Design a protein with these regions (language model features):
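Short, charge-rich amphipathic segments
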Residues: 92-110, 139, 171-192, 239
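Long, solvent-exposed, polar/charged low-complexity segments
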Residues: 2-6, 10-82, 192-271
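Alpha-carbonic anhydrase
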Residues: 45-56, 85-90, 174-177, 187
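Generic structural hydrophobic/aromatic packing signal, biased to beta-strands
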Residues: 71, 102-106, 139, 148-150, ...
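Aromatic- and glycine-enriched beta-alpha-beta binding-site module
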Residues: 100-175
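Short, internal acidic amphipathic alpha-helical interface segments
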Residues: 130, 155-217
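Glycine-rich, compositionally biased intrinsically disordered regions
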Residues: 68-117
């Protein structure tokens, strides 16, 4: 999040891991780099706790950042987005001394954040300084998964409350229609096991979700995940995958615009 990245090790890691990254091939200017096996393996314990794998994680983080920046460029006529990334090195005060997930996220740009600060006042606006307290579009890696999502962190109560207030003012059907355009995604409430599958949602199922969702207490996410276990990882290493991630994140932009506080979605303090 908004923390210094710290020391970057020059180590190359454990050469015994199968599928070590080959020498990079020359790619067209502006092309997104495909993922490599080390992007995932450097996040698996015990490597996730080792600074010897900082270089691998830094390379993976930069690939994710390029995906998020491509999304921001593509979406700039619809919404202005600012890109941030997670840290890639084990740093106990931030990640408990292990890096098991890397992400890049696109969230409201400085001008939009300034408007929100004016709306909520200086005291509450202090919470906006950490980017994750704003809703965001996310590209993420774990040892066994690749993910794109729209997420409102449990501490991002401004946007969570705005979302809930909008559904109360307009009813759930507009959101239902947006979610059911997102075949392949699922709606997620914190770490609950409920199945809210986009493309198959009914108004009753969405009512069930919002019966339990509490801004400030629960994570809200609309996410799509691809398995990346070593035995089946070849699919996520294909050169077209980063562009696919940009495409899938672009599909989330309408839900982002619906939920996030803005001039066009101003429900935060509605009665």
């Amino acid at each position: 999040m908004d923390h210094p990245d710290g020391r970057v090790s020059g180590g190359t890691g454990d050469d015994s891991t199968p599928g070590a990254a080959p020498a990079p091939r020359k790619r067209p200017s502006g092309a997104l780099e495909p993922f490599v096996p080390w992007d995932f393996e450097a996040l698996r314990p015990p490597r996730s706790r080792s600074a010897d794998h900082n270089d691998h994680r830094l390379a993976a983080r930069r690939r994710l950042e390029a995906v998020a920046k491509a999304l921001a460029t593509r979406s700039k006529k619809e919404v202005k987005l600012e890109v941030r990334t997670s840290i890639h090195n084990p740093f106990p005060p931030v990640n408990g001394g292990r890096v098991e997930r890397l992400w890049a996220y696109a969230t409201r740009a400085k001008a939009a954040k300034t408007k929100l600060r004016r709306t909520i006042g200086a005291d509450l606006a202090k919470d906006l300084d950490q980017a994750y307290r704003n809703g965001y579009l996310c590209a993420a890696l774990e040892a066994d998964a690749l993910e794109v999502s729209f997420r409102i962190h449990q501490d991002g109560w401004f946007d969570g409350r705005n979302l809930v207030k909008r559904t109360q003012a307009e009813g759930l059907r507009p959101l239902l229609e947006l979610l059911n355009e997102l075949e392949g995604f699922r709606l997620q409430l914190a770490d609950w096991k409920g199945e809210w599958i986009c493309g198959e949602l009914s108004i009753e199922r969405l009512e069930e979700f919002f019966k339990y969702y509490e801004p400030g207490e629960h994570l809200f996410a609309v996410q799509r995940r691809w398995p990346a276990q070593e035995a089946i990882r070849e699919a996520v290493l294909a050169p077209e995958v980063p562009d696919l991630m940009v495409d899938e994140m672009s599909r989330l932009v309408p839900v982002y615009r619906y939920a996030m506080w803005s001039d066009e979605s101003d429900f935060l303090f509605s009665s």
